[in-house]
Amino acid sequence: MTIFNDKYMCMLELSGIYKSFFKQRILEDVSFTVASGEITGLLGPNGAGKTTIIRIINKIFTQDQGHVSFNGSLLTQKHIAQIGYLPEERGLYKSMTVEDQAVFLGRLRGMTKQDVKTALNYWLERFDIEDWRKKRIEELSKGMAQKVQFICTVLHDPELLILDEPFSGFDPINIELIRSELLKMKAAGKTIILSTHNMKSVEEICDRVVLIHKGRKVLEGNVKTLQNESKQGIYALTFKGNMIAFANALWVGYEIIDKEVHSDDLFTVYLKMRSENELNDLLNTVIPHVKIQKAAEVLPSMEEVFMQQINKEREEASHE
C-alpha cells in the first residue's frame, strides 16, 4: 500500500496499464495513484483515453497489461460494489419512476429495497425534491434528470466515486449544487475521481490531478505544487492612479502583458518579470506613483500547465 503522507493513504493504484482496440493503442504504460479522502482530477483532451481508464477501473474493460489495486488488493469484481460511477453517457429508464429507478440501480449494488428507500428519502430531502419520487423520468427536465442520475450514483454510499464529465450539460445552479455535494462528501472521507476535458471546471476543487494525453500520463501531482512549478513570473496589480504614470515608473525589468480598466482611475495590470526581480522590487518601483490596492502572483491554470508540459515534450522529442 502506498503512503502519501501522514493523513492520506492510497485507495486506488494503476500500474503499467496498456490497452488496445483492433491493434490501435489506446493506453500506454499508464500508472498513477489516487489518495483516500481526496478529490483527484483525471484531466486531458477528448480522446486522450480517460474514459477507457475509468472503464478499466470499473471492470467494464480488461487491460492488456498492468494491474489495478483497490485498498492494497488487486481489483476484483467484488470491489465494484464499493464504487459509484456516473458515466458521460447518462442513462436512465425513461418509463420508470424516480423511486423505481433508484430501487433497480440500488439492488444492482447489493442494497435491500428498504435501504434504497431510506437512502432515497435522505437525498430527495437534501436536494429539496421530495415530490419527484413518483414522477416518471420522461416527465423530468434535463436538469432534474441529472440530479436523479447523481442521486442514483451515490445511493449506495460508495467508498470511491467516479464522475466522467460531471458538469457536462449542467446549468450553473446544478453545477454549484453538485460541486458543493462533492466537497461535503470529501469532508466525510470519501474518495472522488473527476474526469473531464474541461480542466477549469474542476481545478479549484481537486487536490491532485493526473494529466492524460494520447493515451499516456504526462503529469501527476498536487494542484498547487504543479501550478507553482509552472509559474511564469506573472503578477496582477490593482491600483488607483494614473495609468501613464504607472507605465512610466516601470523599467525594462517588467513587461505589461494585459490590463483591465475598472474606472477612470482604477486599473488591474498583469506584468511579467523579465529578470530575477521579486514582487517587493516591483512594489518599491511603483508605490511612489500610484496607490496599490492588491498585488498577487498569478498561478497558471491547469490547462496552461498541461500545455507547458506538452510543448516541453515536443521540444525534447524534436532534439532526439
Predicted segments, located by residue:
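Conserved ABC ATPase signature
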Residues: R136-G143
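ABC transporter nucleotide-binding domain
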Residues: S180-K272
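Conserved ABC ATPase "signature" region
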Residues: V103, R107, Q114-W132
